[in-house]
Design a protein with these regions (language model features):
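A short beta-strand micro-motif common to beta-rich folds, especially ectodomain repeats
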Residues: 50, 146-158
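An acidic-aromatic substrate-binding cleft motif
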Residues: 163-179
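Short coil/turn motifs at secondary-structure junctions
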Residues: 55, 157-159, 177
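Surface-exposed binding patches on compact interaction domains or structured appendages
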Residues: 2-32, 56-135
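Short, surface-exposed loop/turn segments at beta-strand-coil junctions that are enriched for proline
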Residues: 57, 138-145
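Hydrophobic residues positioned within well-ordered beta-strands of beta-sheet architectures
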Residues: 48, 70, 133-136, 150-152, ...
């Protein structure tokens, strides 16, 4: 298993993508291949992103679902080294100067993914939003080389038992430097 996405509720769409992809609210990002490796040398940072969309909003057709809020929970043996952030969309009225080149992703005013906020334990996200959870593992010297699972679970925040809505599993490999 490298990357596995399990959708248990009809109104959620999830997609793993690399950390450099800009995930716009109105455009489906390029998916990370199921067999793609998330890896780094020990002491380096390894990153990936999880794009999420509720109600099939913008990523496809969907319908209104009964849940209003979902809790996001991250589990991993390397959790002490894991930094999970939410990428917030911010408005931009001046995206590019009139005289610009081809190096811009977009030129028109709108919402742009820019602001990183720390995702706290059991963070609650609204079904009215779409966005990105960005995961970075700082593979410090204390993190032993090896392959570690990272599981990101979305559960219904309104139910006491927290019905699982979706789950994403990926593997992160920390490589030992070889001389």
């Amino acid at each position: 298993m490298k990357n596995k996405i399990e959708i248990l509720y009809d109104g959620i769409q999830l997609q793993l993508t690399d950390s450099l992809t800009k995930v716009f609210w109105d455009e489906r990002p390029k998916a990370m291949a199921e067999e793609a490796a998330v890896q780094a040398l020990r002491g380096e940072c390894v990153s990936f992103q999880l794009a999420y969309s509720f109600e099939g909003w913008r990523f496809g057709e969907g319908r209104v679902q009964s849940f209003r809020f979902a809790k996001v929970k991250v589990e991993s043996p390397v959790l002490p080294y894991l930094q999970v952030r939410k990428v917030m969309n911010v408005p931009s009225r001046y995206a590019a100067h009139k005289k610009n080149d081809d190096n811009y992703l977009r030129r028109e005013p709108g919402l742009y993914p820019d602001l990183l906020e720390t995702l706290e334990d059991d963070c609650v996200v609204s079904r009215k939003t779409s966005g990105t959870a960005s995961g970075s593992i700082w593979s410090s010297g204390r993190c032993a080389p090896g392959t570690y699972p990272v599981c990101i679970t979305f559960t219904d925040a309104q139910e006491a038992d927290g019905q699982t809505l979706a789950c994403v599993e990926t593997e992160v490999t920390i490589l030992a430097p070889k001389l």
